Amino acid sequence: MKFARIRSVALAALLATSAPAAMAEATFSTRGLTVETALKAAQAALEACRKAGYQVGVAVSDRSGVMQVYLRDRFAGPHTVDAAANKAWTAASFRISTTELASETQPGKPMSAIRQIPRVAALGGGLPIEAAGSTLAGIGV
């Protein structure tokens, strides 16, 4: 009985000292936009489009493509909800502007089948938001 207890204490001590190192190797950290920053980005895009005479919807997704913010101008059509969300998702997912993706996925090009993936928006209006070499989010208009 005493030996079993000593063995249990030794095993617990071993796990306690090796767990932080093992955990550090088994996890990773990511960076992303706060919802406040995502909202500011969406507001800036909406204002720029208004100044250019466009009524739009603007979506900002996190780096995984999950929508954080959506703004729709008063006269923006109902299609703008899905269009903006899919452009933000595409830009974040592929880490490329949707205009560039549209060019790279034209019929006959090696990556043309990407257009068959649900939610891919291969048309202009989506950009990845990047900082320090990392994609933080996607924005779509």
Predicted features and spans:
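Bacterial N-terminal signal peptides
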Residues: V9-A19
